[in-house]
Swiss-Prot record:
Protein name per UniProt: Succinylglutamate desuccinylase
Binding-site positions, Zn(2+): H59, E62, H151
Pathway: Amino-acid degradation; L-arginine degradation via AST pathway; L-glutamate and succinate from L-arginine: step 5/5
Keyword Hydrolase belongs to the record: yes
Family as reported in the entry's similarity comment: Belongs to the AspA/AstE family. Succinylglutamate desuccinylase subfamily.
Stored InterPro entries: AspA/AstE_fam, AstE_AspA_cat, Aste_AspA_hybrid_dom, SuccinylGlu_desuccinylase
Length: 335
């Protein structure tokens, strides 16, 4: 196997390869771009016209997606996977991956779409670097652009594998992309309705990629992800990389759609979230339930039918989202 196929090993050891470009016997070109970043180019004349960005490790303790990218890259480097798509493999926060921690100083997935310019420190610099990697990768005209940012969650979930679909004013969510997600094993998709500061929101809003945050189970240490079944996703990603993906059609049977009703924003250290510490994502909440309180008699009371909570986290910094209240969506606004 080509040495550049061991991107995770290079990242974990903080090692820069002596040879920055390698070519497989079949003409697939691997190029090291910087820490945690590798570009794969298909052989000349065998390119299907897709640019695919696969990122993981934005949070360093979310290891199942990192291991998935490692398997895919090994397959490319040893010739078992035969790319016809141009692919970038990207490990988001190498320092946090090495420590096995969510982040070093601050959550890097709250620093995109210009937010890093208002901050400082290691993660702010890395967010700017990740944006530049993506900007250069997606700069080629007249090519399809797809970004999957792979994560696992800090808590359990009643729906284990789901996606978040970013928002851009004037741009509709794609039914075809939702069907592709369903074929890849996603059980639900949250259709977002406002701009965001995550990595996938940046590539969707600024670089015109079809982009998604994929939540794939619960965060566990390296080598302890037997309970996270990524077989369907891995199979689909190989098909996308090889350019032989079966047509998914536009049927969304079995895929649950949700939209954001409200975001719960923490404004002060007086913020209180009235939920059990171990509550799971997608837990249902009844109308009239007092969800959260903050200073100045600020209260969040559930008013929506069928409301559920995802990503509850009262420990975020002031001004950030401490949870999302979501409701079922009919999908009538899809393209």
């Amino acid at each position: 196997m080509l040495a550049l196929g061991k991107l995770l090993e290079l990242t974990l050891t903080d090692h820069e390869p002596a040879e920055k470009t390698q070519v497989t016997p079949k003409g697939v070109r691997l190029r090291w771009l910087g820490e945690g970043a590798l570009e794969v180019r298909p052989p000349e004349g065998d390119d299907c016209g897709l640019d695919l960005l696969l990122s993981a490790g934005i949070h360093g303790n979310e290891t199942a997606p990192i291991e998935l990218l490692e398997r895919l890259l090994h397959g490319v480097a040893n010739g078992k996977i035969k790319p016809r798509s141009r692919v970038m493999f990207l490990f988001g926060n190498p320092a946090a991956i090495r420590k096995g921690e969510r982040f070093i100083e601050q959550d890097i997935n709250r620093l995109f779409n210009g937010r890093h310019e208002l901050s400082s420190g290691f993660e702010a610099l890395r967010a700017a670097e990740l944006e530049q990697f993506a900007r250069v990768f997606f700069s080629k005209p007249e090519r399809a652009r797809l970004h999957y940012d792979l994560h696992t969650a800090i808590r359990g979930s009643k729906i284990e594998q789901f996606a978040l679909y970013p928002y851009k004013e004037g741009r509709k969510h794609s039914r075809r992309e939702l069907a592709r997600l369903a074929a890849a094993g996603m059980e639900a998709v949250l259709l977002q309705s406002k701009s965001s500061i995550t990595f996938s929101a940046f590539t969707y809003e600024q670089l015109d990629a079809e982009a998604f945050t994929l939540e794939l189970g619960k965060a566990r240490p390296f080598g302890q992800n037997e309970q996270v079944n990524l077989d369907k996703l891995e199979e689909r990603l190989i098909q996308i990389i090889e350019g032989n993906e079966p047509e998914a059609g536009d049927s969304l049977d079995g895929l649950k759609l949700f939209s954001v009703a409200r975001e719960i924003i923490k404004h002060s250290e007086g913020f209180r979230l009235h939920l059990p510490v171990d509550i799971e994502n997608f837990s249902e909440l009844s109308k009239g339930y007092l969800l959260a309180e903050d200073l100045a008699e600020m209260r969040w009371v559930v008013e929506e039918e069928g409301a559920r909570i995802i990503f509850p986290n009262p420990k975020v910094k002031n001004g950030l989202r401490a949870g999302i209240l979501i409701v079922p969506d009919s999908g009538q606004r899809l393209d």
